[in-house]
Amino acid sequence: PWLTSGKPINFELTMPQTVKYLYKQSGRKPDLDLWTKFVPVSGNLNVDEVDDIEKIWASTARKIGYSKNKLKKEIYPISSLYAIADHSRTLLFALADGALPSNSGGGYNLRSIYRRSMDFANKYNVKLDYSKLIELHAKELKPQYPELSKSVKSVQEILKAEERKYTQSKIVSKRIISKIIKTTVDENKLLELYDSKGITPEELSEASKGKIKVPSDFYLKVASRHEKR
């Protein structure tokens, strides 16, 4: 069990082969000394519970003896690998159970987490093979959920189709982004672009060289909008 293992990162115990694969494909590994100090105080960094997340990052970094920038530089890429692991496992369970990605309802959530995981992979140069991830998850889960192994091929096919749609959406997005960054973009516009075009605020921020800011609670607001529909 994680609590008695003495390790700071539970993903390394709950999905070891998947995480090992992601470390290899990204060329990154966690700084265990930093993570051992960070994990006990990381609960303060819930964006839905604080008014100024950057201030909390700074105070958290000071508490454990790091600069804010150094802490973020370590935490963001590694936590993105764990997000990819978590999202892909969720997709295996959901798709094996018969759900499908779509632009509405629960299917919207599945499409969103797939695309978020791909965005993380692209941002941090992870050489990601989603089919391999699905195989690793099914293998690790086989003792508890042997039925998942029977669905691996069908899940891989669904995700290959999603990858084609994702790639096409990025091509279209680039054309739209080049026009959008010349205009004023408020939070409502960011939400509209994400919902209708799949354009993330991170893409707009990067293209505008930081002029367009990413709201810290953006994805919470996206989820809230869809819960109300």
Task: Annotate each language-model stretch with its function.
Residues 1-229:
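A glycine- and charged-residue-rich anion-binding loop/surface
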